[in-house]
Amino acid sequence: MKKTQTWIITCIYLQLLLFNPLVRTQGICRNRVTDDVKDVTKLVANLPKDYKITLKYVPGMDVLPSHCWISEMVEQLSVSLTDLLDKFSNISEGLSNYSIIDKLVKIVDDLVECMEEHSFENVKKSSKSPEPRLFTPEKFFGIFNRSIDAFKDLEMVAPKTSECVISSTLTPEKDSRVSVTKPFMLPPVAASSLRNDSSSSNRKASDSIEDSSLQWAAVALPAFFSLVIGFAFGALYWKKKQPNLTRTVENIQINEEDNEISMLQEKEREFQEV
């Protein structure tokens, strides 16, 4: 019986190990992002609208894949948030500006550490350092939120291109979160991709989705088949052991009956002797 229990426990651990790769595909740094990022809205409301925050904006956020800029962008966000933290006094109130910024700094620092552990080999950084720019709180934390969203889905998947060049001549795209100070000077890869029509872009997007689905299937199918095989072996093992267990129970019952008969015979002999 103990051997059967040990075998069942072994099967459970085996299935956990088989499904472990599925957990790893959900974003390499996803667990570093806490619910404290939701306080960004409160922080933006507390800061003056015309307040300026210095940030060395990493070009390429709007034209290159996230793995091309996320590592350097999070480092610059850490520097800017730390500098912003130093400008506020340490207030004990739970939702004070200092408290919120301090939590955001910890999140960003954890992301920096995570990216150091999971570096992308195909990213070739620009030789020029990003130039510092001034952003309003709304635009600055718009960049922050965009970087956090990129981390939630970031996976260690090798990009198709051999390298992605981050050009220092690129500037933020003009939208509700980021302003433009200079025209775009796109790197060769990005420029050639933007020359394609909308149908080509849609095809690339669909190809990306298909590639992601294939990568997921490549991990899920082996784990699924391993799970089925594991349960099949478990069923065979149980069927093999079941007759043995039945015979063991029958033998025990027979031995008990024999013992009772022997005891009765012995008592009968003792009674006859008396």
UniProtKB/Swiss-Prot annotation:
Cytoplasmic compartment spans: 239-274
Post-translational modification: A soluble form is produced by proteolytic processing of the extracellular domain.
S-S bridge residues: C29-C114, C68-C164
Gene Ontology cellular component terms for the protein in this record: cytoplasm; cytoskeleton; extracellular region; filopodium; lamellipodium; plasma membrane
Residues bearing the modification Pyrrolidone carboxylic acid: Q26
Main location: cytoplasm
Keyword Iron carried by entry: no
Protein keywords: Cell adhesion, Cell membrane, Cell projection, Cytoplasm, Cytoskeleton, Disulfide bond, Glycoprotein, Growth factor, Membrane, Pyrrolidone carboxylic acid, Secreted, Signal, Transmembrane, Transmembrane helix
Carbohydrate-modified residues: N90, N97, N145, N196
Subunit-level organization: Homodimer, non-covalently linked. Heterotetramer with KIT, binding two KIT molecules; thereby mediates KIT dimerization and subsequent activation by autophosphorylation.
Role description: Ligand for the receptor-type protein-tyrosine kinase KIT. Plays an essential role in the regulation of cell survival and proliferation, hematopoiesis, stem cell maintenance, gametogenesis, mast cell development, migration and function, and in melanogenesis. KITLG/SCF binding can activate several signaling pathways. Promotes phosphorylation of PIK3R1, the regulatory subunit of phosphatidylinositol 3-kinase, and subsequent activation of the kinase AKT1. KITLG/SCF and KIT also transmit signals via GRB2 and activation of RAS, RAF1 and the MAP kinases MAPK1/ERK2 and/or MAPK3/ERK1.
PANTHER family, alphabetized: KIT LIGAND (PTHR11574:SF0)
Family the entry assigns: Belongs to the SCF family.
Record-given protein name: Kit ligand
Organism: Sus scrofa
